[in-house]
């Protein structure tokens, strides 16, 4: 959350990756920034080296409440989906630099974090994870899996509850081969340039919503992301949930995979849109998200996804509330982890986690 306790011309906070935590798979890279002169761009630096610009302009009502007198504070978020597995195993640092429209800049506090990695560049086969022969144990907010099979390699995994994700994240990997995961592989397109919507052979207008994933179950804080290209340029990306406009998505994230499919479309290499989204803010049950891309000449491209939400009784489990598994029991089967009698914020639940390719991790898919 934001606090209005500074008079600096440019303000910036990097919220994920979380300082002193362990990250793996596909997660969020996010924060917020403000400038009295408006924010021009956000740079992300990894291990002291410039990595990329992050799309800016996401909805942040909390920042707006903390800084009501600064124009644009309610659209001050920056966010993108990021494959932490594109980094080597071990310790890393990240910082964000905000530049305002007058040329001033401000660095965020550097975040020190670690990366744990699985066994391949990218696990694209949803059945490559097999827990049939795994042994499980539970302790406080952790799930230990011994002898899990990942692409036929025996691996021991440790998962831990993370407040930022509102779910369990892999924080330790033992066994197998540790050389894995490049972001460009994760984002390889399942479409060809021939599938683009075209008014003429020289005109392209295309939008693809990648998460939430069609017909899947989502819970906790995840990504809402995709890409859009147009020969005449993209003006904005609107997000509709269950037919109602909710916000614009920050646009302009690096997508070399899209550029490879649309090399002749200007801006295709920076065609991603993404934001961190708390799916628990929605009611349990079925929902539809639609992304509407508006071109600079008034054209429109749409892409939608129908999905389901499962959730605890609260929309957000704060860090002061307890996730306690010490008296729970656990069984594993295929790609699923089933936990019985878990205590979450004082209430008792049965919870099912399932392996998800998009996240490269286990997501909560059932809560009873």
Regions found by a protein language model. Give the residues of each.
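Long, low-complexity serine/threonine/glycine- and acidic-rich segments characteristic of extracellular
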Residues: 1-368
């Amino acid at each position: 959350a934001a606090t209005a306790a500074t008079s600096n011309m440019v303000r910036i906070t990097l919220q994920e990756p979380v300082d002193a935590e362990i990250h793996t798979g596909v997660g969020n890279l996010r924060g917020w920034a403000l400038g009295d002169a408006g924010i021009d761009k956000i740079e992300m630096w990894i291990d002291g080296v410039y990595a990329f610009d992050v799309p800016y302009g996401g909805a942040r009502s909390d920042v707006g409440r903390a800084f009501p007198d600064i124009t644009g504070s309610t659209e001050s978020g920056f966010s993108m989906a990021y494959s932490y597995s594109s980094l080597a195993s071990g310790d890393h640092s990240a910082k964000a630099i905000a530049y305002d429209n007058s040329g001033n800049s401000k660095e965020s506090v550097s975040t020190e974090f670690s990366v744990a990695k699985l066994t391949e560049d990218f696990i694209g086969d949803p059945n490559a994870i097999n827990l049939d022969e795994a042994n499980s144990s539970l302790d406080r907010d952790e799930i230990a899996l011994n002898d899990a099979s990942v692409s036929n390699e025996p691996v021991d995994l440790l998962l831990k509850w993370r407040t930022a994700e509102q779910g369990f994240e892999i924080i330790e990997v033992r066994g197998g081969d540790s050389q894995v995961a490049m972001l460009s592989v994760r984002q390889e397109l399942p479409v060809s340039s021939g599938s683009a919507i075209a008014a003429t052979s020289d005109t392209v207008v295309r939008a693809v919503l990648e998460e939430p994933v069609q017909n899947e179950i989502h819970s906790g804080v995840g990504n809402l992301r995709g890409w859009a290209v147009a020969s005449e340029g993209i003006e904005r990306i609107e997000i509709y949930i269950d037919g109602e406009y909710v916000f614009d998505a920050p646009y302009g994230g690096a997508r070399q995979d899209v550029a490879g499919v649309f090399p002749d479309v200007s801006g295709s290499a920076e065609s991603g849109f993404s934001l961190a989204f708390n799916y628990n803010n929605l009611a349990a049950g079925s929902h539809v998200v639609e992304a509407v891309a508006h071109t600079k000449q008034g054209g429109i491209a749409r892409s939608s996804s129908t999905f389901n939400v499962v959730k605890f009784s609260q929309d957000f489990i704060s860090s002061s509330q307890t996730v306690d598994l010490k008296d729970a029991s656990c069984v594993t089967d295929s790609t699923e982890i089933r936990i019985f009698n878990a205590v979450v914020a004082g209430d008792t639940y049965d919870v099912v986690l399932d392996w998800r390719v998009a996240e490269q991790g286990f997501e909560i898919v059932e809560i009873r």
